[in-house]
Design a protein with these regions (language model features):
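Soluble metallo-hydrolase cores and metallopeptidase-like ectodomains found primarily
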Residues: 139-174, 249-366, 380, 384-388
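Alpha-helical metal-binding/catalytic segments enriched in His/Glu/Asp
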Residues: 338, 354-408, 413, 567-570
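Sec/Tat-exported extracytoplasmic proteins
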Residues: 56, 60, 65, 69-79, ...
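Metal-dependent peptidase/peptidase-like ectodomains
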Residues: 122-124, 234-300, 347, 403-550, ...
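Noncatalytic luminal/extracellular "stalk/propeptide" segments of secretory-pathway proteins
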Residues: 26, 30-47, 54, 66-186, ...
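C-terminal amphipathic alpha-helical interaction region
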Residues: 673-770
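A conserved hydrophobic secondary-structure block that centers on an alpha-helix together
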Residues: 160-233, 345-349, 361, 366, ...
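Second-shell loop/turn segments in exported
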Residues: 47-55, 69-78, 147-152, 186-193, ...
Length: 770
């Protein structure tokens, strides 16, 4: 779904060389333990992983990608169902118990869309993506859907046009300072700077009657690089499709929040579905946007609002008047989730769950099939191990999700259907999505941070041959050396110099980890390669094709193999370690940073409010504005009280001590100095399996986001995909809800205290084996 906005953590890459299929691991020094394994176990595990690597083959990935992306495969299409059946059959052939699980979901598809400029000149938008020379796939659009935004309302509206920049909250403040109101208007915003669904949601809340979203060439067209087919970036008539379902409230089927969308499920009327918008929304190309924007007058747009079209950007309103019409079929469609299992030989009730979605907006070669074929390679290699006599300690569950693009439908409905079982059995959910040349990007639960470092530190970059961690540290040091480096880059450079674990990112939303991590509290991880590619230009368009991917994504499929190898090592270690390989010192340090960020956020907000108040009292804004083109002063900000962060600061001190004690005894377990009975191991793993759920709250998050339960990681109410850490406190501070902030300081501190208590129980159990 979202190709790269939620991740900060990166590791590997450079230029293109041919891929040699097979193992690409960097041999660890002899006698070095793998995290979670004794010396003897480490040798066996390395040998297992080498056998796994030897069965990863780039030609497999290429062949699967070409087949799966050969026709449009959106939800409800014949090719989507055919792909599900083909994937199921392959899993069965490889020795997995694979079945298709179906759900019935609300999935609107367009019947009629139209956009025309009525005056001062006339123009009718084409709303089509023509074939591109040299891209045979782009000609095979029969059965595909035209560009549209799913879950925008039906409507036939006419009104003056207003340009909104990116259509985010600060843009409305800038409009207000220019005396412009969007009530009763149709707004046009460019993609970027935040999740697409927030643009029409905010427009709706501000009284707009329709919303148009376009891709400006400055962001992913000729302003970023050569356009397709010369380069990889968005051509003039390329359109980014996408869902505008309000997933800041909940993901999944809009009609069945919190329960699986089975045939017999009780459904809301569409009019009561909170995630379905109330105004029509339509995405367009920059070729179609240019005549609309050129017809605007009113104030000239501020410098940071100006794109790369050869026009003067004006804000409006008018004199441009537009007519927008959207009509959809609002019926139910069937989802086809492929669920494949290998039962655990010793711990069958502990599940390692692995998933990647399969559906696309059109062909979906990049998003999601590049990641999906890597997952298939893992499954095939695991099948070879299985047929050789190996069996995993824990149960493996591999999932090919349907319906991710419209709103994480397949994963959410499956997770909600099996919620109780997952909360008792799942020890990990490991997600992937788009994959391509570049850097390893990892995000997730910070108790997994050390495992990620340990597993990826033994993997070669396919193109440079150096270890991922060594190359990452070099990158971090170089970025921090830049005199204009951000505070984050300088902080990363300090971490690189210190030589400890490289941090993984916190997860917001945008892919199928969301229902597992943020709704159910399952320890989760998201892994991919990317960053040295031109995917942005064809994201969610007719040009996300096999031809584009093999030119600009991963020509040799080296990074597909690297993805399979990296993810496979994590899966195998989680499956086979006697004691779940979690480490808590990194988690404690991360929480300490988040709490310090909250204090700084409050202090900075207070200082800003005071400085703004002083400038307003001195009439500084009115004196500084251009009298010919006046800009109104900003609104006065409320006073910022002093919050009591002591409950969080005190629990952080306890958390650091608890984490240090557990990790020290776990290290002794690896060294063979701690011996546990099978019964003690089972009890210990039971405690560890539920650690992440201790960080959730049954009441959910404010404001009115009860589906989101996680108190440490959540997508922001005003960022969409972007993460907010300690969200109940952070977002309450940002929205000046001081009583709610104080309340969630207490709620979050209590959850972290319960987390410490559970961890202390695990430590006590380990100590009994000394």
């Amino acid at each position: 779904m979202n190709y790269r906005v939620r991740r900060l953590w990166v590791v590997v890459a450079s230029s293109v060389v041919p891929l040699l299929a097979g193992a690409a691991a960097v041999p660890a020094p002899a006698g070095t333990n793998l995290f979670g394994f004794t010396a003897a176990e480490s040798g066996n595990q390395r040998e297992l992983e080498q056998r796994f690597d030897a069965d990863l083959n780039a030609s497999d990935l290429r062949g699967w990608l070409k087949t799966l992306s050969s026709e449009p495969n959106q939800v409800g299409s014949p090719h989507d169902k055919a792909n599900a059946e083909a994937v199921r059959d392959l899993f069965q052939q490889w020795g997995w118990d694979a079945q298709i699980e179906t759900f019935e979901v609300l999935y609107p598809t367009p019947k009629q869309v139209g956009l025309e400029l009525l005056g001062p000149t006339k123009f009718v938008a084409t709303l089509k993506e023509p074939p591109v020379e040299g891209d045979e796939s782009s000609t095979r659009t029969a059965g595909g859907l035209p560009p549209y935004n799913a879950y925008g309302a039906d409507g036939d509206v006419t009104g003056d046009l207003v340009y909104l920049n990116y259509g985010m909250p600060d843009d409305y403040k800038d409009l207000a300072r220019r005396g412009i109101d969007v009530k009763g208007k149709i707004v046009i915003a460019r993609y970027g700077a935040g999740w697409r669904g927030l643009k029409p949601k905010l427009a709706q809340e501000h009284g707009a009657i329709g919303c148009i979203i376009y891709s400006d060439p400055r962001d992913d067209g000729y302003g970023a690089g050569d356009v397709y087919p010369k380069g990889g970036f968005r051509p003039a008539q390329g359109v980014q499709r996408g869902s505008v379902q309000d997933m800041t409230l909940y993901s999944g089927d809009p009609l069945t929040p919190g329960v699986g969308a089975t045939r017999k499920a009780k459904r809301l009327p569409i009019s009561q579905a909170k995630t379905v918008l109330k105004i029509p929304v339509l995405p367009i190309s920059y070729a179609d946007a240019q005549p609309l924007l050129a017809a605007l007058e009113g104030p000239v747009a501020p410098p940071n609002w100006r794109g790369a079209l050869p026009i003067t950007y004006h804000v409006g309103p008018g004199p441009a008047k537009v007519h927008l019409t959207v009509s959809s079929d609002w019926g139910l469609k069937t989802l086809y989730d492929v669920i494949a299992k290998i039962p655990g030989a010793q711990n069958p009730d502990e599940w390692v769950v692995r998933g990647n979605h399969r559906d696309g907006w059109v062909f979906g070669a990049w998003d999601p099939l590049s990641g999906h074929v890597a997952m298939m390679a893992e499954a095939k290699a695991i099948g070879v191990l299985l047929k050789s006599g190996w069996k995993p300690r824990r149960t493996l569950v591999y999932a090919s999700w349907d319906g991710e693009e419209p709103g994480l439908l397949g994963s959410t409905e499956w997770a909600e259907t099996h919620a109780e079982e997952l909360q008792h059995k799942a020890v990990l959910y490991l997600n992937s999505d788009t994959n391509s040349r570049g850097f390893l990007e990892a995000g997730g639960s910070h108790s997994l941070q050390h495992l990620v470092n340990d597993a990826t530190g033994a993997v070669k970059d396919p193109e440079t041959g150096v270890s991922t961690i060594a190359r990452l540290r070099a990158r971090m040091l170089v970025r921090g050396f830049d005199k204009s480096a951000s505070a984050e880059a300088r902080h990363d450079a300090q971490l690189a110099a210190a030589g400890g674990d490289v941090p993984i990112d916190a997860l917001g939303s945008g892919s199928d980890f969301t229902p597992f991590l943020q709704h159910l509290g399952i320890t989760s991880l998201d892994l991919a390669y990317g960053g040295e590619d031109d995917q942005a230009g064809v994201y969610h368009s007719n040009y996300d094709t096999f031809e584009h991917y093999v030119r600009f994504g991963d020509p040799t499929f080296a990074y597909g193999v690297a993805e399979a190898e990296t993810v496979g090592h994590v899966v195998l270690r989680m499956a086979d370690a006697d004691v779940l390989p979690l480490q808590f010192t990194d988690f404690a340090a991360t929480i300490a940073e988040y709490v310090e960020e909250l204090r700084k956020l409050t202090d900075d907000k207070r200082k800003s409010s005071e400085e703004l108040g002083k400038l307003l009292d001195e009439n500084a804004f009115s004196l500084a504005t251009d009298p010919i083109r006046p800009v109104l002063p900003p609104e006065r900000e409320p006073a910022v009280p002093y919050l009591n962060f002591a409950p969080l600061e005190n629990v952080v001190t306890r958390l650091k001590a608890s984490a240090k004690a557990y990790d020290a005894l776990h290290a002794k377990l690896e060294a063979g100095d701690v011996k546990l009975t099978p019964a003690q191991i089972k009890e210990l793993n039971g405690l560890l399996q539920g650690m992440e759920q201790a960080l959730t709250t049954a009441r959910g998050l404010p404001p009115n986001r009860d589906w989101y339960k996680h108190l440490i990681y959540a997508p922001g109410a005003l960022t969409g995909y972007g993460v907010k850490t300690i969200p109940g406190v952070r977002e309450s501070i940002e929205s000046n809800q001081w009583d709610v902030a104080n309340e969630y300081i207490g709620i979050t501190a209590a959850a972290l205290s319960a987390y410490c208590t559970r961890l202390d129980r695990a430590t006590k159990l380990l100590s009994q084996g000394g």
